[in-house]
Protein backbone atom coordinates (compact mmCIF):
# COMPACT_ATOMS: atom_id res chain seq x y z
CA UNK A 1 0.00 0.00 0.00
CA UNK A 2 1.29 3.44 -0.96
CA UNK A 3 0.67 6.51 1.20
CA UNK A 4 0.85 10.05 -0.18
CA UNK A 5 0.87 13.45 1.53
CA UNK A 6 0.16 16.68 -0.34
CA UNK A 7 1.36 19.72 1.58
CA UNK A 8 4.49 20.07 3.70
CA UNK A 9 3.26 22.51 6.34
CA UNK A 10 3.31 21.69 10.04
CA UNK A 11 0.79 18.81 9.87
CA UNK A 12 1.95 17.37 6.55
CA UNK A 13 5.55 17.39 7.71
CA UNK A 14 4.66 15.83 11.06
CA UNK A 15 2.67 13.01 9.42
CA UNK A 16 5.40 12.28 6.88
CA UNK A 17 8.14 11.93 9.45
CA UNK A 18 5.95 9.97 11.87
CA UNK A 19 4.86 7.53 9.17
CA UNK A 20 8.48 7.14 8.10
CA UNK A 21 9.82 6.60 11.61
CA UNK A 22 7.31 3.90 12.59
CA UNK A 23 9.13 1.47 10.33
CA UNK A 24 5.96 0.10 8.73
CA UNK A 25 6.11 2.08 5.47
CA UNK A 26 9.05 1.66 3.10
CA UNK A 27 10.53 4.75 1.43
CA UNK A 28 9.24 3.64 -1.97
CA UNK A 29 5.69 3.45 -0.57
CA UNK A 30 5.67 6.92 1.01
CA UNK A 31 5.12 9.93 -1.27
CA UNK A 32 5.27 13.67 -0.62
CA UNK A 33 4.30 16.61 -2.84
CA UNK A 34 4.42 20.32 -2.11
CA UNK A 35 3.75 23.50 -4.08
CA UNK A 36 7.29 24.69 -3.35
CA UNK A 37 9.45 21.70 -4.23
CA UNK A 38 12.59 23.15 -2.62
CA UNK A 39 10.89 23.10 0.78
CA UNK A 40 10.41 19.33 0.66
CA UNK A 41 13.83 18.29 -0.63
CA UNK A 42 14.88 17.46 2.93
CA UNK A 43 12.45 14.53 2.76
CA UNK A 44 14.13 12.86 -0.22
CA UNK A 45 15.83 10.39 2.10
CA UNK A 46 12.57 9.05 3.52
CA UNK A 47 9.99 9.43 0.74
CA UNK A 48 9.38 9.75 -2.98
CA UNK A 49 9.23 13.47 -3.82
CA UNK A 50 6.92 14.17 -6.75
CA UNK A 51 4.11 16.40 -8.04
CA UNK A 52 0.48 16.26 -6.92
CA UNK A 53 -0.86 14.32 -9.90
CA UNK A 54 1.87 11.68 -9.82
CA UNK A 55 1.23 11.19 -6.12
CA UNK A 56 -2.53 10.88 -6.67
CA UNK A 57 -2.10 8.32 -9.44
CA UNK A 58 0.31 6.15 -7.44
CA UNK A 59 -1.07 6.22 -3.89
CA UNK A 60 -3.87 4.25 -2.24
CA UNK A 61 -4.33 6.76 0.59
CA UNK A 62 -3.89 10.46 -0.22
CA UNK A 63 -3.61 12.96 2.64
CA UNK A 64 -4.33 16.56 1.61
CA UNK A 65 -2.74 18.89 4.16
CA UNK A 66 -3.39 22.37 2.74
CA UNK A 67 -5.23 25.51 3.81
CA UNK A 68 -9.01 25.69 3.28
CA UNK A 69 -8.58 28.38 0.61
CA UNK A 70 -6.25 26.09 -1.35
CA UNK A 71 -8.31 22.92 -1.02
CA UNK A 72 -10.52 23.28 -4.10
CA UNK A 73 -7.54 24.00 -6.36
CA UNK A 74 -5.62 20.98 -5.09
CA UNK A 75 -8.63 18.67 -5.39
CA UNK A 76 -9.31 19.92 -8.91
CA UNK A 77 -5.67 19.33 -9.79
CA UNK A 78 -5.68 15.69 -8.67
CA UNK A 79 -9.29 14.70 -9.45
CA UNK A 80 -8.52 13.01 -12.77
CA UNK A 81 -5.43 11.27 -11.36
CA UNK A 82 -6.93 9.66 -8.25
CA UNK A 83 -7.45 5.92 -8.37
CA UNK A 84 -11.09 4.85 -8.37
CA UNK A 85 -10.66 3.03 -5.05
CA UNK A 86 -8.24 5.43 -3.36
CA UNK A 87 -9.04 6.94 0.04
CA UNK A 88 -8.84 10.72 0.14
CA UNK A 89 -8.01 12.16 3.58
CA UNK A 90 -8.31 15.87 4.32
CA UNK A 91 -6.93 17.56 7.42
CA UNK A 92 -9.37 20.42 7.68
CA UNK A 93 -12.62 20.40 9.60
CA UNK A 94 -13.99 23.42 7.70
CA UNK A 95 -14.22 21.51 4.42
CA UNK A 96 -17.34 19.34 4.37
CA UNK A 97 -17.86 16.13 2.48
CA UNK A 98 -20.53 17.88 0.39
CA UNK A 99 -17.98 20.50 -0.71
CA UNK A 100 -15.44 17.84 -1.63
CA UNK A 101 -18.04 15.85 -3.57
CA UNK A 102 -18.55 18.83 -5.88
CA UNK A 103 -14.97 18.36 -7.10
CA UNK A 104 -14.23 14.67 -6.62
CA UNK A 105 -16.60 11.90 -5.57
CA UNK A 106 -14.44 9.25 -3.89
CA UNK A 107 -14.02 7.58 -0.52
CA UNK A 108 -13.16 10.42 1.83
CA UNK A 109 -12.14 10.84 5.45
CA UNK A 110 -11.49 13.91 7.55
CA UNK A 111 -8.70 13.68 10.10
CA UNK A 112 -7.90 16.21 12.84
CA UNK A 113 -4.66 15.39 14.70
CA UNK A 114 -3.36 17.19 17.77
CA UNK A 115 0.01 18.79 18.47
CA UNK A 116 0.59 15.96 20.94
CA UNK A 117 1.10 13.66 17.94
CA UNK A 118 4.73 14.79 18.20
CA UNK A 119 5.07 12.50 21.23
CA UNK A 120 2.70 9.83 19.84
CA UNK A 121 -0.15 10.87 22.16
CA UNK A 122 -2.53 12.56 19.76
CA UNK A 123 -6.27 12.26 20.26
CA UNK A 124 -6.97 12.16 16.53
CA UNK A 125 -10.50 12.93 15.37
CA UNK A 126 -11.67 11.07 12.25
CA UNK A 127 -14.93 10.93 10.31
CA UNK A 128 -15.89 9.29 7.02
CA UNK A 129 -18.25 9.83 4.13
CA UNK A 130 -20.75 7.14 3.18
CA UNK A 131 -18.43 5.54 0.62
CA UNK A 132 -15.88 4.36 3.20
CA UNK A 133 -16.26 0.76 4.33
CA UNK A 134 -15.04 -1.01 7.45
CA UNK A 135 -11.87 -2.31 5.78
CA UNK A 136 -10.73 1.20 4.84
CA UNK A 137 -11.58 2.47 8.31
CA UNK A 138 -9.43 -0.24 9.85
CA UNK A 139 -6.49 0.54 7.58
CA UNK A 140 -6.63 4.28 8.29
CA UNK A 141 -7.08 3.75 12.04
CA UNK A 142 -4.06 1.46 12.15
CA UNK A 143 -2.02 4.03 10.25
CA UNK A 144 -3.08 6.88 12.54
CA UNK A 145 -2.53 4.79 15.67
CA UNK A 146 1.18 5.42 15.16
CA UNK A 147 0.61 8.97 16.44
CA UNK A 148 -1.85 8.19 19.25
CA UNK A 149 -5.49 7.31 19.85
CA UNK A 150 -8.10 7.50 17.07
CA UNK A 151 -11.59 8.81 17.90
CA UNK A 152 -14.35 8.44 15.30
CA UNK A 153 -17.09 11.10 15.36
CA UNK A 154 -19.94 12.02 13.02
CA UNK A 155 -19.15 14.92 10.71
CA UNK A 156 -21.43 17.34 12.57
CA UNK A 157 -19.40 16.84 15.78
CA UNK A 158 -15.95 17.31 14.24
CA UNK A 159 -15.95 21.03 15.08
CA UNK A 160 -16.45 20.56 18.82
CA UNK A 161 -14.22 17.50 18.76
CA UNK A 162 -11.47 19.68 17.31
CA UNK A 163 -11.94 22.20 20.12
CA UNK A 164 -11.50 19.43 22.69
CA UNK A 165 -8.38 17.78 21.28
CA UNK A 166 -6.74 19.82 18.51
CA UNK A 167 -7.26 23.30 19.97
CA UNK A 168 -7.03 22.15 23.59
CA UNK A 169 -3.22 22.15 23.89
CA UNK A 170 -3.33 25.88 23.11
CA UNK A 171 -6.18 26.45 25.55
CA UNK A 172 -4.43 24.49 28.30
CA UNK A 173 -1.12 26.28 27.70
CA UNK A 174 -2.89 29.66 27.87
CA UNK A 175 -4.67 28.81 31.12
CA UNK A 176 -1.55 27.60 32.88
CA UNK A 177 0.49 30.50 31.50
CA UNK A 178 -1.96 32.82 33.29
CA UNK A 179 -1.67 30.76 36.49
CA UNK A 180 2.14 30.81 36.39
CA UNK A 181 2.24 34.55 35.69
CA UNK A 182 -0.07 35.18 38.65
CA UNK A 183 1.98 32.91 40.92
CA UNK A 184 5.13 34.82 40.01
CA UNK A 185 3.72 37.93 41.69
CA UNK A 186 3.34 36.10 45.00
CA UNK A 187 6.71 34.36 45.37
CA UNK A 188 10.47 34.60 44.99
CA UNK A 189 10.57 31.22 43.23
CA UNK A 190 12.08 31.74 39.74
CA UNK A 191 9.60 31.72 36.84
CA UNK A 192 11.33 28.79 35.16
CA UNK A 193 10.94 26.68 38.31
CA UNK A 194 7.30 27.73 38.72
CA UNK A 195 6.52 26.59 35.18
CA UNK A 196 8.30 23.27 35.66
CA UNK A 197 6.49 22.61 38.95
CA UNK A 198 3.09 23.37 37.44
CA UNK A 199 3.72 21.38 34.24
CA UNK A 200 4.88 18.30 36.11
CA UNK A 201 1.93 18.53 38.50
CA UNK A 202 -0.49 18.98 35.59
CA UNK A 203 0.95 16.00 33.71
CA UNK A 204 0.96 13.79 36.81
CA UNK A 205 -2.61 14.77 37.68
CA UNK A 206 -3.80 13.77 34.21
CA UNK A 207 -1.97 10.45 34.41
CA UNK A 208 -3.38 9.82 37.90
CA UNK A 209 -6.94 10.46 36.73
CA UNK A 210 -6.58 8.19 33.70
CA UNK A 211 -4.81 5.37 35.55
CA UNK A 212 -7.12 5.45 38.58
CA UNK A 213 -10.28 6.34 36.61
CA UNK A 214 -10.83 9.44 38.73
CA UNK A 215 -13.26 12.24 37.82
CA UNK A 216 -12.39 15.91 38.16
CA UNK A 217 -14.66 16.03 41.19
CA UNK A 218 -12.80 13.06 42.72
CA UNK A 219 -9.52 14.96 42.54
CA UNK A 220 -11.02 18.20 43.86
CA UNK A 221 -12.66 16.35 46.77
CA UNK A 222 -9.44 14.56 47.69
CA UNK A 223 -7.30 17.71 47.65
CA UNK A 224 -9.73 20.45 48.68
CA UNK A 225 -10.67 19.45 52.23
CA UNK A 226 -13.57 21.28 53.84
CA UNK A 227 -12.46 24.59 55.27
CA UNK A 228 -8.96 24.16 53.85
CA UNK A 229 -6.68 26.29 51.69
CA UNK A 230 -7.25 24.43 48.41
CA UNK A 231 -11.01 24.76 48.82
CA UNK A 232 -10.69 28.55 48.80
CA UNK A 233 -8.91 28.38 45.45
CA UNK A 234 -11.32 25.91 43.85
CA UNK A 235 -14.26 28.08 44.91
CA UNK A 236 -12.79 31.01 42.99
CA UNK A 237 -12.23 28.86 39.90
CA UNK A 238 -15.75 27.41 39.92
CA UNK A 239 -17.24 30.87 40.55
CA UNK A 240 -15.28 32.83 37.95
CA UNK A 241 -13.93 30.51 35.26
CA UNK A 242 -17.21 29.13 33.78
CA UNK A 243 -17.99 32.45 32.08
CA UNK A 244 -14.50 32.55 30.56
CA UNK A 245 -14.84 28.96 29.30
CA UNK A 246 -18.26 29.71 27.79
CA UNK A 247 -16.92 32.81 26.04
CA UNK A 248 -13.90 30.86 24.77
CA UNK A 249 -16.09 28.27 23.06
CA UNK A 250 -18.50 30.93 21.78
CA UNK A 251 -15.63 32.76 20.10
CA UNK A 252 -13.87 29.70 18.68
CA UNK A 253 -17.02 28.04 17.37
CA UNK A 254 -18.14 31.30 15.76
CA UNK A 255 -14.72 31.62 14.10
CA UNK A 256 -15.07 28.02 12.94
CA UNK A 257 -18.49 28.84 11.44
CA UNK A 258 -17.12 31.86 9.56
CA UNK A 259 -14.17 29.84 8.29
CA UNK A 260 -16.56 27.17 7.02
CA UNK A 261 -18.61 29.84 5.22
CA UNK A 262 -15.50 31.16 3.47
CA UNK A 263 -14.51 27.63 2.51
CA UNK A 264 -17.99 26.97 1.10
CA UNK A 265 -17.82 30.19 -0.92
CA UNK A 266 -14.50 29.14 -2.44
CA UNK A 267 -16.03 25.84 -3.58
CA UNK A 268 -18.94 27.69 -5.22
CA UNK A 269 -16.72 29.93 -7.32
Where are these regions (language model features)?
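NAD(P)-dependent Rossmann-like dehydrogenase/reductase catalytic/cofactor-binding core
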Residues: 199-269
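NAD(P)+-binding Rossmann beta1-loop-alpha1 motif at the extreme N-terminus of oxidoreductases
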Residues: 1-57, 185-186
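Rossmann-like NAD(P)-binding element
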Residues: 53-81, 87
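A short helix->loop->beta-strand "cap" motif at the edges of active sites that frequently abuts
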Residues: 26-27, 82-86, 106
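ADP-ribose/adenylate-binding Rossmann-like module
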Residues: 82-96
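Internal alpha-helical scaffold of NAD(P)-dependent oxidoreductase catalytic cores
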Residues: 99, 103-107, 123-161, 171-211, ...
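Rossmann-fold dehydrogenase core element
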Residues: 87-90, 100-115
Amino acid sequence: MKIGIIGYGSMGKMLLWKFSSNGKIAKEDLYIANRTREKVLEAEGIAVVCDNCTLASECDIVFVCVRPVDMKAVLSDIAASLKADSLLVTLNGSITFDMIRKVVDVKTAKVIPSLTAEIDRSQTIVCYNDKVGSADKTVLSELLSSIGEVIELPENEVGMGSELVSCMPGFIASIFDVICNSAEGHTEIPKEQIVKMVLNTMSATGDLMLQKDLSFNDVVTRVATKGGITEEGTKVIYDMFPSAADEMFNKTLEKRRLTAEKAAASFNE
